[in-house]
């Protein structure tokens, strides 16, 4: 049961939400007609909502375990996997053709003039990122435990009154200074 590999690091709420999403995705594979899918999805939502406010964690954990076992027995043998998702037919297929963003810096001014709004906004973001990069890295280093992150959750948002975080697409890359 590979889907439980990160189980100890997730909260109960995260486990329930992931189970619900997996169940809906498998239900989508069973019910290809949209109206039938919607009907059974509403029934499933009602089953989850029935125990939403459960205060007893022992009972809630037992319910989650039973729900995961039921999901295991009722899952689709060949669930639909989106082509660009991991395990899909086109996963990472076209990454070699994607042009990195820094290539836009080499555009000729006449080419940039065709998209003035985009390049004006892009220059503002680049300037903002250059100005706040050191603070971003410092904040991430302060909030990351010495042994590395203990969960797969992303770091929290910035402190109140500060700029929004700019690391949403850099979070999986090494922390080098941006261009």
UniProtKB/Swiss-Prot annotation:
Its main location: mitochondrion. Keywords: Acetylation, Electron transport, Membrane, Mitochondrion, Mitochondrion inner membrane, Phosphoprotein, Respiratory chain, Transport. Residues 136-162 are annotated as: Disordered. Disulfide bonds: none annotated. The modification Phosphoserine is found at residue 85. One of its GO terms (cellular component) is mitochondrial inner membrane. The keyword Secreted does not apply. It is found in: Mitochondrion inner membrane. It is a peripheral membrane protein. Pfam families: Complex1_LYR. The modification N-acetylalanine is found at residue 2. InterPro entries: Complex1_LYR_dom, Complex1_LYR_NDUFB9_LYRM3, NDUFB9. One of its GO terms (biological process) is mitochondrial electron transport, NADH to ubiquinone. Mammalian complex I is composed of 45 different subunits. Accessory subunit of the mitochondrial membrane respiratory chain NADH dehydrogenase (Complex I), that is believed to be not involved in catalysis. Complex I functions in the transfer of electrons from NADH to the respiratory chain. The immediate electron acceptor for the enzyme is believed to be ubiquinone. Belongs to the complex I LYR family. This is NADH dehydrogenase [ubiquinone] 1 beta subcomplex subunit 9.
């Amino acid at each position: 049961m590979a889907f439980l590999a990160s189980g100890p690091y997730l909260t109960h709420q995260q486990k329930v939400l992931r189970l619900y999403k997996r169940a809906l995705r498998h239900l989508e594979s069973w019910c290809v007609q949209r109206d039938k899918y919607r009907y059974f999805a509403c029934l499933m939502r009602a089953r989850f909502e029935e125990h939403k406010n459960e205060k007893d964690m022992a009972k809630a954990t037992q319910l989650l375990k039973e729900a995961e076992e039921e999901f295991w027995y009722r899952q689709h043998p060949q669930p639909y996997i989106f082509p660009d998702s991991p395990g899909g037919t086109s996963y990472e297929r076209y990454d070699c053709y994607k042009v990195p963003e820094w290539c836009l810096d080499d555009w000729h001014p006449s080419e940039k003039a065709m998209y003035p709004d985009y390049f004006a906004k892009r220059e503002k973001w680049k300037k903002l990122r250059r100005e706040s990069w050191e603070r971003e890295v410092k904040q991430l280093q302060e909030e990351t435990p010495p042994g590395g992150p203990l969960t797969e959750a992303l770091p929290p948002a910035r402190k109140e009154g500060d700029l929004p975080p700019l690391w949403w697409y850099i979070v999986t890359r090494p922390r080098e200074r941006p261009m």
